[in-house]
Amino acid sequence: MGSIDNLMAQKLTSQFPMNTLEPEEFRRQGHLMIDFLADYYRKVENYPVRSQVSPGYLREILPESAPYNPESLETILQDVQTKIIPGITHWQSPNFFAYFPSSGSTAGFLGEMLSTGFNVVGFNWMVSPAATELENVVTDWFGKMLQLPKSFLFSGGGGGVLQGTTCEAILCTLVAARDKNLRQHGMDNIGKLVVYCSDQTHSALQKAAKIAGIDPKNFRAIETTKSSNFKLCPKRLESAILYDLQNGLIPLYLCATVGTTSSTTVDPLPALTEVAKKYDLWVHVDAAYAGSACICPEFRQYLDGVENADSFSLNAHKWFLTTLDCCCLWVRDPSALIKSLSTYPEFLKNNASETNKVVDYKDWQIMLSRRFRALKLWFVLRSYGVGQLREFIRGHVGMAKYFEGLVGLDKRFEVVAPRLFSMVCFRIKPSAMIGKNDEDEVNEINRKLLESVNDSGRIYVSHTVLGGIYVIRFAIGGTLTDINHVSAAWKVLQDHADALLDEAFTAN
C-alpha cells in the first residue's frame, strides 16, 4: 500500500505544482510593489489629475483573452505604468479638490495590506475572534473621541460596526426601522411607511428606500432655502409629518445630515430630533464627511443632538486617513439590526454564538462575508494618535479659510454658501459678466470654467447646484495637499476665468 500511496502523491504533486504563496517570492514581489507605489506617490502630482482618456481606451490596448502562460510581476507592473495609470483619476494627487477627499496614509495602507494578507472572512466571532473584538474596541475608541453618548458604545449597551460605505449604513438602519415598525403595525402596512430628509440629503437614502420597499410616493425630500443655508427646517418637517398622519400614513425614518455633500451645511439636530421623537421616528445622523472633524473640540458642537438619535455614521475613508472602504456605524439598539439582518443556518451554528456573549457581525450588515477592516483603523489611530489626527483636520480647515479669503479678494467671484469645514462653494458672480446678468448665462460660464480647468489636468474640481445656482465646489482634504497647492489651484482658476470672461466680453 505504501508504494501505491507514494505513486498517487507523486502524481498529484505533478498535477498541482503551483505554490502561489511561497514566502521568499512573496517577499521579493512585495518589495517590488512597495517600491512601485512609493515612486508613484513621489511623482503623483505630475500626472493630469483627471484622466484624459476616452471611453473604451483600455479594451483597445489589452489582449482579447487572458494569457495561457504566467507573466512576471515586472511585466505586469510595466503595463500598469503604461496602460492603467493613464486611465486613473488621481484621487491622492495634492491637486485633487473634487467631491470629498479619499485621504490615504502609510498607516492606512499598511493596515489594509495586513488585512488582505491575513485574508480572514470574519462573519462571526468564532471564525476570527480578533477581527470581531478589535472592531468592538476601535469603534468604542472612535466613539469616545467623538464624545458620542455612552449608549452608542458597547460599554453602554449600544455598539459600532464597520460597514463598507454610508449607503450600506443607511440601508441597514432603514431596514431595521422598517421591520421594527411593521412588527407593531402589521407587515401589510409597508405601503404606508414614510421616509423624511431634505433635498440636500445624499442620494444614498433614496436608493436605500427603494431597496427597502418604501413606496416612492412616500419619500419626502423637504425643500431647503438659501436663507436657511440649505438646512432642513424642523417646522417644515413637522408639517410634513402631520400631513402624512392626517392621510393615514406612518412616519418611519428621518435622515439628518452633518456636512451635506453640496455645501457641508449642518442640519439642526436638537430641534429635528425633538420633532422626530414626538412622532416615534427612527433618526439616523449621516456625518459621512464632516463627522471626522468632530474629534476636534471646536467642531464637536455640530453633533449636539446626536444623543437623541438612533444611529450615527461617518466615513473614515473620507477625511480620516483610512483607505476605502471604512464606514463607521454606531447604533443605540443593536438588537434592532440583529432582528432584521440575522441568519443562522445549520452550517454556521457554533457554541460561541449560542452563548449570546459574542458579537456576530454578519447580523449587523447586509452581506455574510466581511473583511478585517478594523486593522487599518486601528493602525491609523495608533500611528497618529488623537492629537495628530486633530491637527491633520485643522490643517485642511485652515487651507480652506485661506482659499475662501482668496475668493473674497477677487471681485469677480463670490462665496455662495457659508464655509464650515474644508470646502468652499463659489462661482463667478453676475456682476463680472458685462451685459449678461441672466442666471442661466451666469450658470453656463461657471460650467465652462469647471470644464476648462478640469480639461487642463492641472487641478480637478466638481460642482453642485444650490437654489438654482451652479456652484463650483473646492474641497480640501488630500493627504499630500499643502498651502502651495491651494495657491496654485486658485491661480489656475483665475487664469481660466480671465480667458472665459475675455471671450464673453469680445462676443458682446
UniProtKB/Swiss-Prot annotation:
Enzyme class: lyase
GO cellular component, one term: cytoplasm
Swiss-Prot/TrEMBL GO biological process terms: amino acid metabolic process; carboxylic acid metabolic process
Keyword Lyase attributed: yes
Quaternary state and interactors: Homodimer.
PROSITE patterns per the UniProt record, alphabetical: DDC_GAD_HDC_YDC
Family: Belongs to the group II decarboxylase family.
Protein name per its UniProtKB record: Tyrosine decarboxylase 4
Positions where N6-(pyridoxal phosphate)lysine occurs in the chain: 318
Domain of life of the native organism: Eukaryota
